């Protein structure tokens, strides 16, 4: 009811967004181009949609290239342009990098990660210092000032019936799907859905394979056998994590929900308990022997078709 009362502000927000997009469409706002291919991965809504997972999946698909991920580094405790990692060599802490860029840098030793509010400037620094062959623009759908050679848009089921901010969670109207070159329908393992536009469309599934301990070493699921866990997450959509735990049959005696990008500075695990969270949250809680993250691999239907779509930009 409270968010419905914000509908007049959503109408105003829509006018502002439409005006901004028109300025880009008509060429009144300049779009800058980097000299190597750029693949943008983004979404239409605030909150979790699987962007970070898909970016890491994409980086693995491009293993034969020198990949650099360009990220804003949301809520990081630094400003400007920052090299987070150089092909596996971590340069900064998670606080300086932001949790998502740091997680990608930690789990992807074959790529480089750069954080910058201005992704074009980040790209220029990367070209000077890292010699990448391709950029992946993380959360790039609304960052229209940078040219992209392939524009991939992630959608989750909730997006299709949501409202614009602040009455809902959409950052742009659904009609802006027109700008996407390809669509990825996420969270199919918990909320399967179909969506047809005539654009290349792929379904994304998460396949849960193991646990990670606080050193990010793989641990078998067996440690949870006959145990109840305290689960928690600080994501854009904590409800998705709860659904995953339920679908996997994990016994949860308590679930704690924190805001997205929560820093856990006031969090102390109790001895004798087992805690289960996500990799993004775990990077802020290293050193605890009883805190684990649920790890998964991303699977895409028609992966070969996606590969062909991606590799066309290099020729």
From Swiss-Prot:
Transfers the gamma-phosphate of ATP to the 4'-position of a tetraacyldisaccharide 1-phosphate intermediate (termed DS-1-P) to form tetraacyldisaccharide 1,4'-bis-phosphate (lipid IVA). The lineage of its organism: Bacteria, Pseudomonadati, Aquificota, Aquificia, Aquificales. NCBIfam families: lpxK. One of its GO terms (cellular component) is plasma membrane. One of its GO terms (biological process) is lipopolysaccharide core region biosynthetic process. Its EC number is 2.7.1.130. It catalyses: a lipid A disaccharide + ATP = a lipid IVA + ADP + H(+). Keywords: ATP-binding, Kinase, Lipid A biosynthesis, Lipid biosynthesis, Lipid metabolism, Nucleotide-binding, Transferase. ATP binds at residues 45-52. This is Tetraacyldisaccharide 4'-kinase. Pfam families: LpxK. Belongs to the LpxK family. GO terms for molecular function: ATP binding; tetraacyldisaccharide 4'-kinase activity.
